[in-house]
A protein has these predicted regions:
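Short, flexible helix-loop junctions that flank or precede catalytic/ligand sites
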Residues: 1-375
Length: 375
């Protein structure tokens, strides 16, 4: 293990390799070679394990002097940066067992279209809403930022509005098109989400993107901004529409929750929940998507604290207004042989229901495959 920091490669070369291999993430840590995340799995580069001097040299090469000083104080730092002709990157530098480590994620310069992302067409319609709250949810690495970027780009391309994004850090860059887009980064442009949201209404926005609703104050601000005639996009680390609604309501003290349910029932325009799933028999991943678009019945269920009944509304809402449960999305991907049964069942929210869907398909397939009578 090289302890001298006399590297045979630099961070730029590693990031270039990361992009060329189609990795979503790269990890730099002591005792292991640089590791790439490809299609969700960790893959080591054919390089020797790194020592603490090397990991610090690699990670610090991405930082300004000001950022280095900030890191030395807190032992962790979020940042984003771009390399011309290659890609943008989001990074978190941190310490583990006394040594510097880093996680780097690719962010393409070009914003993908909805067709390229595999997002249902109904999701793009959220860009035309005049006001309200749209939630994009899912676990880390499920493509939430990419879907949000596509929505912002569609508004930016088609409408003459003022868009403000509040991000930690800024990921996709949005040039002014028909709209103007002001992108604010936590740390460099504003103290925090709470601070930025306190002043955002004075900045005359039409659309506000909140990178992540992390706490009560941020959630409360998102509801207020959407209630006052603005369109708000935000993310949550939840796995479905029902858990997203519960997360928002449960963030408030019990004596405020009835009022919050009423407010949410009025402003919520939709919930999109995403999961990236390994493609069967080929490299890459495909998107599983749950979409919930509140109708009168769903708004009433939110208001009356009967959120658990929303699932049945989503099950029957697929043909009427484009809603679908995650199970319906998984079943569609499985029936088209895009994902394996094992991967689908691992991610199914209502496993018994999903098994019945699969058994129904198997029964129909065996029925249709029977030879005609008399042969």
């Amino acid at each position: 293990m090289n302890q001298s920091g006399d590297l045979k490669f630099n961070l730029h070369q590693l990031l270039k390799t990361m992009v060329e291999k189609g990795a979503s993430d790269m990890h730099i840590t002591t005792g292991a070679p640089p590791m790439l995340r490809i299609d969700g799995a960790m893959v080591p580069l054919k390089l020797p394990p790194l020592g603490p001097v090397e990991t610090k040299a690699l990670c610090f090469s991405a930082l300004s002097e000001e950022q280095k000083a900030q890191f030395e104080k807190s032992n962790e730092l979020d940042l984003s940066f771009g390399i011309k002709g290659l890609s943008r990157f989001r990074s978190n530098i941190f310490t583990q067992r006394g040594a510097v480590a880093g996680a780097f994620r690719t962010i393409p310069f070009r914003v993908s279209t909805f067709d390229e992302l595999g997002v249902p067409a109904i999701v793009s319609d959220f860009s035309n809403k005049p006001n309200g709250l749209v939630l994009i949810t899912g676990p880390t690495g499920s493509g939430k930022s990419t879907t949000l970027a596509a929505l912002i780009d569609k508004i930016n391309t088609e409408q003459r509005l003022h868009i403000i994004t509040i991000e930690d850090p800024i990921e996709f860059l949005h040039p002014h098109k028909l709209s103007i887009v002001n992108q604010r980064e936590i740390g460099s442009d504003t103290e925090g989400f709470k601070h930025a949201l306190r002043y955002v209404l004075r900045q005359d926005p039409d659309v506000v993107l909140i990178g992540e609703m992390r706490d009560l104050e941020t959630i409360e601000a998102a509801l207020t901004i959407s209630e006052t005639g603005h369109l708000v996009f935000a993310t949550l680390h939840t796995n479905g529409a029902i858990s997203s609604i519960n997360r928002i309501v449960d963030a408030f003290p019990p004596h405020h929750q009835s009022q919050v349910r009423t407010k949410l029932s009025l402003v919520l325009q939709g919930v999109v929940s995403q999961q990236l799933i390994p493609r069967m028999g080929a490299p890459g991943r495909v998107l599983g998507v749950e979409t919930m678009i509140p109708n009168a019945a769903i708004r009433n269920l939110i208001r009356e604290d009967k959120v658990h009944q929303i699932y049945s509304q989503m099950q029957v809402g697929q043909e009427k207004n484009g809603m679908q449960t995650l199970n319906q999305s998984l079943y569609s991907l499985y029936s088209r042989r895009l994902i394996s049964l094992e991967e689908a069942m691992t991610r199914a929210i209502e496993l018994d229901e999903f098994k019945m869907m699969v058994e129904g398909r198997t029964t129909m397939a065996s029925h249709h495959s029977r030879p005609p009578m008399g042969r």
